Amino acid sequence: MGKAQIIQHQARRILSQSNRNCLFRRSYETLPAANQTLPSRIKTDINQKASIIPLLEQWRKQGYEVNPSHLRGLIKNLSDCKNFTTALEASKWMFKHSVFDNFPEDCAAQLHLVNTVLGLEEAEKMFKNIPEKMRDYSVLLSSYTKPVRTVDKAEATFKKMRELGFLLKPYLFNSMICLYGQLQRLDMVEKLLYKLKKNNMEVGSLKVNNVSRVYANINAMEKFKTWVSKEGIELERDTIVAMAKAYHRAGSIEKAR
């Protein structure tokens, strides 16, 4: 099993943990009644988008050990609720105090939060400080493929991932396909789709957002349609509808049907 597969497997294992259990476990046998309400106070502070760091510090100083799965679950749930700032606070606290051994996916989760809250420049700074064996390039690639202005960095990151043997999932190719679609780079879209097929990866249905932008003109669309048919790639219904509309706008009524 390659490094990227190990990371992804570990991420799924950790993030599958339920957040319905207790967030912390007591290192002693008894729990003082005065502390029984602390979990509810944490929940209240989260709902009010207040900093939870003082409560985490208090809980830890009173002799409670952090449950890794549940703290990770807390961070994930905060992110799912788009409470990214509080999630980043909890993630940084987790790293600062080394409350348990961190995994590459912990770094990836924090990198995503840094990019979301503080921006791409800060995310790049953080990435440079992550030990090589703990780096997850997929987060960085995703960040680079969103703004067109970072195409050079996206291509460099994609190349690095290929050299390291990390390009094991179709979604990594899809990120670049989407980027090249925005740039009207039909040649690169075809090249990446060919690599997916060559590597025996499941292409599946192509999302309309990933390919519709390459239809700069009817000739390009005809070429793409022929190539897709030859390779046996299934187009999503929305993509077929988008192509039909493009034919209709160009006056090719028969082809639009």
UniProtKB/Swiss-Prot annotation:
Keyword Nucleotide-binding: no
Source domain of life: Eukaryota
PPR repeats: 133-168, 169-203
UniProtKB keywords: Repeat
InterPro entries linked: Pentatricopeptide_rpt, TPR-like_helical_dom_sf
GO molecular function: mRNA binding
Pfam families tied to this protein: PPR (PF01535)
Family per record: Belongs to the PPR family. P subfamily.
Descriptive protein name: Putative pentatricopeptide repeat-containing protein At1g43010
